[in-house]
C-alpha cells in the first residue's frame, strides 16, 4: 500500500469501525474488578480475567447503587468506545451486577494473608524509629519519582543524614528477585533505619508488596522499617509488618528524619526557657542573700548591742569595785598618815621633848656623855649648844 496515514486517521478509522459494530454497541462483560478509582464524579476501573484487561468507566454517579469494589466479580453492561486522545478502547458502562463468586486476585490475597497470619508475621512488636538517624537505607527504583521525593524531603528536613540507595525494580518479571536482593543487602548493612517505597499504581502494580516471600524478608530485617508504598488509599502486606507505615513516599521520608528547622526552634525555645529559669534562680538567690545579709546584720547588731551592754555592765562593776578599793585605800592611808603624824619628831618636840646630839648623832643615854663634852640640844623651835659638867 502506498497511502500513508496519520495517527489520528488510524484512530478515527478504528473508532468508526467499533461504533458501527452492533455487537459492541450493547455488550455484557464479566470479569474481576481491579484498580477502582473515583475521579471528578466518575468511576474508573478495570475488568480482568486470567489473560487480559479492559478499561471501564461509569460517567456520573449512577455507579454508587451497584456496590462495586476491588476483587469482586462483576457483570457489566455497556458499549465499547474508543478514547481517541490515548488511542485506547474501553467499556462505557450503563449497568453492573456483582456476582457471588470472588475474583482470583482476591482469593490469592486472602490465602496469602491467612498463611502469614498463621506464621505470626503480623504479630511482631513495632520497634521505635531512631530519633536522629545518621544512615538511611532506601529501597526503591533509582528512576522513580518516589526516589526523588524521598531525597528532596530528607534534604529539606535533615541534610545531616547519609542516604544509601538499594536499587530495585518495583514491577515486572524481575522485580521480585531484585527486591529480595535489595532486602538481603540492606539487612547486612549498618544503616539505622530502612525505607521501602514506590509511587502509586494499580493493584496489580502493587501486588509485589503482597508477595509472601517479600513480606517474610521484610519481617526478618534487623533494622526498623518504614514503608511508603502507593497512595493514601493503598495498603499492602508489608505495611502490616513495617515498624511504621506511611501513606506516601514523602510521608515515609518525613517519618524517617526530624525537621532540623523545628529542632533549631525547639533548641532556641529551650535556651530561652533555660535563660529565664537561670534569671529567676539568680533573682531568688539574690533575694535569699539579701535576706540573709539583713538577718546576719541584724544578728550582728544584736550581738554588738548585747556585747556593749555587757561591757557597760562590766565597766560599772569595775568602777564600783575600784571606788570601793580606793575608799579602802584612802582609809588605810589616812590611818597610816595619822600614825605617821603622831610619830613625827617635831610633834614630840612641841610636847617638851628635846633631842640631844653629839657629833651629829643622837644621844640615847646619859652614860655615854663625859664631862666637858659639847652637845647640842634640839628644841622644836631651835638648837642650843651646851657643855656637860
UniProtKB/Swiss-Prot annotation:
Its main location: cytoplasm. Disulfide bonds: none annotated. One of its GO terms (molecular function) is nucleic acid binding. It catalyses: Exonucleolytic cleavage in either 5'- to 3'- or 3'- to 5'-direction to yield nucleoside 5'-phosphates. GO terms for biological process: DNA catabolic process. It is found in: Cytoplasm. Its EC number is 3.1.11.6. One of its GO terms (cellular component) is cytoplasm. InterPro entries: Exonuc_VII_L, Exonuc_VII_lsu_C, OB-fold_nuc-bd_dom. Bidirectionally degrades single-stranded DNA into large acid-insoluble oligonucleotides, which are then degraded further into small acid-soluble oligonucleotides. Heterooligomer composed of large and small subunits. HAMAP family: Exonuc_7_L (MF_00378). NCBIfam families: xseA. Belongs to the XseA family. This is Exodeoxyribonuclease 7 large subunit. It comes from Pseudothermotoga lettingae (strain ATCC BAA-301 / DSM 14385 / NBRC 107922 / TMO).
Amino acid at each position: 500500500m502506498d497511502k500513508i496515514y496519520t495517527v489520528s486517521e488510524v484512530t478515527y478509522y478504528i473508532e468508526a469501525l467499533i461504533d458501527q459494530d452492533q455487537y459492541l454497541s450493547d455488550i455484557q462483560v464479566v470479569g474481576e474488578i481491579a484498580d477502582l478509582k473515583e475521579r471528578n464524579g466518575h468511576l474508573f476501573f478495570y475488568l480482568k480475567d486470567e489473560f487480559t484487561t479492559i478499561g471501564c468507566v461509569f460517567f456520573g454517579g449512577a455507579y454508587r447503587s451497584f456496590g462495586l469494589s476491588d476483587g469482586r466479580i462483576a457483570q457489566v453492561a455497556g458499549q465499547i468506545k474508543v478514547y481517541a486522545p490515548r488511542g485506547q478502547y474501553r467499556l462505557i458502562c450503563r449497568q453492573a451486577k456483582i456476582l457471588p463468586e470472588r475474583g482470583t486476585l482476591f482469593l490469592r490475597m486472602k490465602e496469602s494473608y491467612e498463611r502469614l497470619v498463621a506464621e505470626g508475621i503480623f504479630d511482631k512488636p513495632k520497634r521505635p524509629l531512631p530519633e536522629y538517624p545518621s544512615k538511611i537505607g532506601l529501597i526503591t527504583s533509582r528512576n522513580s519519582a518516589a526516589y526523588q521525593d524521598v531525597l528532596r524531603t530528607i534534604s529539606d528536613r535533615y541534610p545531616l543524614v547519609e542516604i544509601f540507595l538499594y536499587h530495585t525494580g518495583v514491577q515486572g518479571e524481575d522485580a521480585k528477585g531484585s527486591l529480595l536482593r535489595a532486602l538481603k543487602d540492606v539487612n547486612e548493612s549498618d544503616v539505622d533505619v530502612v525505607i521501602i517505597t514506590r509511587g502509586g499504581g494499580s493493584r496489580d502494580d502493587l501486588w509485589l508488596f503482597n508477595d509472601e516471600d517479600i513480606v517474610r524478608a521484610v519481617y526478618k530485617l534487623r533494622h526498623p522499617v518504614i514503608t511508603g508504598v502507593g497512595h493514601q488509599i493503598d495498603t499492602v502486606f508489608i505495611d502490616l509488618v513495617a515498624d511504621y507505615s506511611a501513606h506516601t513516599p514523602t510521608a515515609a521520608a518525613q517519618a524517617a528524619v526530624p525537621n532540623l528547622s523545628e529542632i533549631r526552634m525547639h533548641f532556641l525555645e529551650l535556651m530561652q526557657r533555660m535563660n529565664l529559669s537561670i534569671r529567676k534562680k539568680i533573682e531568688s538567690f539574690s533575694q535569699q542573700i539579701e535576706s540573709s545579709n539583713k538577718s546576719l546584720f541584724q544578728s550582728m547588731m544584736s550581738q554588738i548591742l548585747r556585747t556593749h551592754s555587757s561591757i557597760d555592765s562590766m565597766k560599772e562593776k569595775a568602777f564600783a569595785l575600784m571606788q570601793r578599793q580606793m575608799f579602802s585605800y584612802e582609809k588605810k592611808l589616812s590611818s597610816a598618815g595619822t600614825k605617821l603624824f603622831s610619830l613625827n619628831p617635831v610633834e614630840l618636840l612641841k610636847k617638851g621633848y628635846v633631842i640631844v646630839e653629839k657629833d651629829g648623832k643622837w644621844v640615847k643615854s646619859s652614860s655615854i656623855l663625859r664631862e666637858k663634852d659639847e652637845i647640842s640640844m634640839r628644841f622644836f623651835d631651835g638648837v642650843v649648844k651646851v657643855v656637860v659638867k
